[in-house]
Amino acid sequence: ISPTFMQTVSVFDVESKTWYLQNTTGDIPPQLTEFCSVLASAADGSSHNIYIYGGYDGLDYNANPSDDVYILSLPSFRWVKAYTGTNTHSRSGHGCIKVYPDQMLAIGGQHVDSTHCLEGGVIVNFNLNTLRFEDEYDPTKWSKYKVPDLVTKWIGGK
């Protein structure tokens, strides 16, 4: 872990079976560890967006973890800060799962202040289309994934 951790990412080329380093641009996240991630792809397959949520800097365990959401869009390798969170809602050491095309559930985790531990619930629902946490979860309500305008503004596309 270093302050430049997210500026360069490791990529595995399945065809040549080799690893290489790829530089990233945009709103590069600070150094983070113990975050969670999910992948959402454009309907036409033209871009793939890796959403990362939460985590902490890996050095100061007593510091507040992150509550921010970042998107790394491929193939442009551009970071976009999708959501700026709060210290009381933040968590690290949690897991994420994409239960529907437009929904990421974050499950569990921890916070340095046990009075704020997992504010909003043990499970929180982040909408990948609106880039907001939802107040409730209803498994009968979901939508197809649409690359958010915040991302297309920087990478192009529809």
Predicted regions and their residues:
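A short beta-strand motif characteristic of beta-propeller blades
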Residues: 20-26, 80-85
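Conserved short beta-strand element of beta-propeller blades
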Residues: 1-3, 9-11, 25-52, 69-71, ...
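Residue-level signature of beta-propeller blades and closely related beta-rich strand-turn architectures
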Residues: 43, 56-58, 110-112
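Juxtamembrane/interface segments of multi-pass membrane proteins
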Residues: 25-28, 59-63, 86-87
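Beta-propeller blade signature
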Residues: 2-17, 64-78, 118-134
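CBM-like carbohydrate-recognition segments
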Residues: 99, 109-121, 133
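Extended hydrophobic-aromatic, low-complexity segments
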Residues: 46-49, 60-66, 79-81
